[in-house]
Amino acid sequence: IALTV
């Protein structure tokens, strides 16, 4: 899961 990009 990418919480920041």
Curated annotation (Swiss-Prot):
GO cellular component terms, A-Z: extracellular region
Keywords for the protein's UniProt record, in alphabetical order: Cell wall, Secreted
Localization: Secreted, Cell wall
Domain of life where this protein originates: Eukaryota
Protein name: 31 kDa cell wall protein
